[in-house]
A protein has these predicted regions:
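ABC ATPase NBD coupling module
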Residues: 20-23, 74-91, 121-122
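The feature captures the beta-strand-to-loop junction immediately N-terminal to the Walker
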Residues: 42-44
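Conserved ABC transporter NBD signature motif
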Residues: 65-73
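Short coil-to-helix segment of the ABC ATPase nucleotide-binding domain corresponding to the Q-loop/switch region
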Residues: 103-112
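Conserved ABC ATPase signature
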Residues: 144-154
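Conserved catalytic motifs of ABC-family nucleotide-binding domains
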Residues: 165
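Catalytic Walker B motif of ABC-type/P-loop ATPase nucleotide-binding domains
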Residues: 169-172
Length: 238
């Protein structure tokens, strides 16, 4: 396994709510995600999967513990610094694609690039075209996203997650809104991109087939990681 750690957390604690409704959502969670690897987090609804992804994605702050990207602690950064780190270093994929329906596929992929503001308009258009070509949509650059199938829309979301060449991709039920065939295609595409480009992918899923096809599986219960073991992808290469 590649020993280069892209994303890690140590002893994460998170409480949600107030007083009698206060919930201990994460309890001492520690995790390391290597470059070029796919890690799946599984467990029942309410076990803390989404809370963990929000903290690792710098969308929420832990009450205790530390998050690091490329071995650099980030939990102490200001809101503006966290936003910059998030935009540059982390790509997000969700169960629902959240595309702008009236934007073309190319324009949707360009949105994170515009937010980061490091490329010219021509450079953004070319990068978006290259990414869409990589997910098999190079012939639909100018098609409004509302005219795409569900599987195609999720492929646009995958391309958008790669827009700023992030080190880390976080995916919350990325295939949960797709049928079985499109789920398998979307995951295989994402898995290949991660392995080929040396990204680190952490996904939360209820799909046992996708979890088993990952490199590592982390089982969560009641806010804790109770077990971690190699998935089928890791076993097949060892």
């Amino acid at each position: 396994m590649n020993s280069e750690i892209c994303l890690s957390c140590e002893a994460i604690e998170r409480y949600i709510g107030e007083e009698e409704e206060r919930v201990h959502a994460l309890r001492g969670v520690s995790l390391e995600i290597e470059a070029g690897s796919v890690h799946a987090v599984v467990g029942p609804s309410g076990c803390g999967k989404s809370s963990l992804l929000y903290i690792l994605g710098l969308l929420d702050l832990p009450d205790a513990g530390r998050v690091s990207i490329d071995s650099e602690p980030v939990s102490h950064l200001s809101d503006d610094e966290l936003a910059q780190k998030r935009n540059k270093s982390i790509g997000f994929i969700f169960q629902f694609h959240f595309l702008m329906e009236d934007f073309t596929t190319q324009e949707n992929v360009m949105i994170p690039m515009r937010k980061l503001g490091e490329l010219s308009d021509n450079e953004m258009r070319q990068r978006a075209a290259d990414l869409l070509e990589g997910v098999g949509l190079g012939d639909k650059l100018r098609r409004p996203s509302r005219h795409l199938s569900g599987g195609e829309q999720q492929r646009v979301a995958i391309a958008r997650a790669l827009a700023n060449d992030p080190r880390v991709i976080l995916a919350d039920e990325p295939t949960g809104n797709l049928d079985t065939a499109n789920s398998e295609r979307a995951f295989e595409l994402l898995q290949n991109l991660v392995h080929e480009r040396g990204k680190a992918l952490l996904l939360a899923t209820h799909n046992p087939a996708i979890a088993e096809a990952s490199d590592w599986i982390h089982e969560m219960k009641d806010g804790r990681i109770i077990a971690s073991h190699p998935g089928g992808a890791q076993s097949s290469t060892s």
